[in-house]
Amino acid sequence: MMKHILKYILIVFLSFVSGRLLAQEASMITRLYDTFSENLVTLEVDYSVKGGGPEVKGKAELQLQGKAYHIVGGGYDIYCDGESVWIVDQTSKEVIIESLTEGPEGYVTNPALLLSRLDEFFDVKSIAGRKYTLKPKTKGEITAAEVAFSPEGKLVSGVFTMSDGNAWTITVNKMTMAPQKPLTAFHPSVRFDKSWIVTDLR
């Protein structure tokens, strides 16, 4: 479950920076989009999942550079170099390797698709101040979404409602920027020797 939580954190994060979806705030979104396109951006977030079972809470750190990203939280590391995704469980010494996925559900296995193609998956249902309610164009895991900005155009929060009834809430506590780094920095740093269970689905 935790690996899915971390992926949806990234989905909410990327939903803020689509340069085309929120046309009503074009100048602010364009500036934010350019910032993410030209820098290595680090986010520190809190997340919670509410639904049929006990509430799940936690913290995570995300780094994004173009379509590459690295997420750390809940005992998992998720790396993506823009072509492949590594889901690493350091405790159990297991790793799953996946190729990026295209199509309407591609954002589940490749949330980076939202950076440039969110408008292919969602429509803006309503706008209230700096809060945007989004509606998916096709039936899938996400049934509704709501994202919000600060007056300065910074990321604030996002809530995604899932088809299983769970509601995912993400709050952005801190955002920093740094110069871009080589894409090899988005590969796992650990060597997967014989002590690891490796599932390569590419």
Task: Identify the role of each PLM range.
Residues 20-56, 65-67, 188-202:
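N-terminal leader/targeting segments and the immediate start of mature chains
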Residues 2-9, 19:
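Bacterial N-terminal signal peptides that target proteins for export
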Residues 100-130:
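Flexible, surface-exposed loop/linker segments and immediately adjacent secondary-structure boundaries
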Residues 61-108, 168:
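An acidic-aromatic
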Residues 45-49, 70-74, 131-138, 157-161:
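Short beta-strand segments that buttress and anchor functional surface loops
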Residues 62-70, 79-84, 127-129, 148-156, ...:
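Short, solvent-exposed coil/turn segments at beta-strand boundaries
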Residues 24, 128-130, 138-144, 152-202:
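Non-transmembrane domains of secretory- and envelope-associated proteins
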Residues 12-22:
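Hydrophobic h-region of N-terminal signal peptides that target proteins for export
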